[in-house]
């Protein structure tokens, strides 16, 4: 295909150093801050980074809940909570003068309902996720959250669960998934045509708004309605033992096709902000201030 692939090699990067790569696939910068800093540099230098490091840096689960709501996609009721603890130097009577406290826990619970899910707004991999069945459970886990920013979310009592792998803002693979077992099921006709179409269309709407070329999203289906309960997974689990060999083969091929296409057909990322384009008209009369537009794949 005329494309070479290798592991990226970087270290002590200079500000004017060119990036030797056309495309970089990032699956680790959320754990290694230096990599994230380098990837923003690489994007400015002209590389296509999967996923866009500027969007990934700005993303969180509460933003995504707000985004889904604005896009008209069914999403569980969600509240972001003030941090339970703060770094040294934060003076509660000065630094937190803008914060309403104590929290109205009963009002919060009345909004999201019980049971509900308390989770880290920036978390993943099922870390710091708690299903709470009483207000006391919510407060208990919140009190143990430390410096994390937590969101409290309505628990959707689902009768069907789907996890989609979305690649290249074009291809979506909806897989039957059981979060209780944390296991995929190889069952190709697990949704009606109508439900399947809606899940795929809503998944594409979300990844195009976020500008993510590699993501997974979880849909809890209740009474035939798919609710987007988690779609902040820019480094999704792609292990063969998780996906099963059948779906793993699909993901590998789709990832390879996407990467080769991006190498041969570069797509500038520095000015991409898919979600901003969707809402530009609400404050600027339908036009982005400088008249620019971000490309959205067909």
What residue spans do the PLM features occupy?
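A structural preference for short, hydrophobic beta-strand core positions in alpha/beta folds
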Residues: 7-8, 51, 77-80, 216
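A long amphipathic alpha-helix within ATP-dependent nucleotide-binding catalytic cores
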Residues: 146, 182-226, 250-291
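A short, polar/charged loop-to-alpha-helix boundary motif
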Residues: 182-188, 238-245
């Amino acid at each position: 295909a005329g494309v070479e692939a290798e592991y990226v090699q970087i270290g002590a990067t200079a500000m004017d150093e060119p990036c030797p790569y056309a495309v970089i696939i990032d699956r680790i910068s959320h754990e290694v801050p230096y990599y994230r800093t380098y990837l923003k540099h690489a994007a400015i230098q002209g590389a296509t980074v999967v996923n866009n490091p500027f969007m990934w840096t700005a993303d969180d689960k509460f933003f995504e809940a707000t985004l889904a709501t604005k896009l008209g996609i069914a999403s569980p009721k969600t509240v972001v909570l003030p941090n339970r603890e703060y770094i040294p130097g934060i003076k509660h009577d000065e630094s937190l003068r803008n914060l309403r406290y104590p929290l109205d826990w009963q009002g919060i619970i009345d909004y999201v309902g019980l049971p509900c899910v308390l989770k880290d707004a920036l978390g993943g991999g099922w870390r710091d996720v708690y299903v709470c069945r009483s207000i006391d459970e919510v407060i208990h886990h919140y009190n143990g959250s430390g410096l994390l920013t937590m969101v409290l979310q309505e628990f959707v009592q689902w009768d069907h669960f789907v996890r989609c792998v979305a690649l290249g803002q074009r291809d979506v693979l909806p897989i039957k998934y059981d979060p209780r077992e944390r296991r995929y099921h190889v069952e190709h006709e697990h949704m009606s045509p109508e439900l399947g179409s809606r899940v795929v269309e809503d998944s594409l709407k979300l990844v195009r708004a976020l500008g993510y070329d590699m993501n997974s999203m979880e849909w809890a289906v209740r009474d035939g309605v798919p609710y987007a309960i988690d779609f902040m997974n820019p480094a999704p689990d792609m292990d063969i033992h998780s996906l099963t060999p059948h779906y793993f083969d699909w993901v590998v091929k789709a990832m390879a096709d996407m990467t080769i296409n991006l190498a041969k057909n570069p797509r500038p990322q520095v000015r991409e902000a898919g979600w901003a384009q969707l809402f530009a008209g609400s404050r600027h009369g339908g036009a982005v201030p400088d008249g620019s537009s971000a490309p959205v794949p067909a």
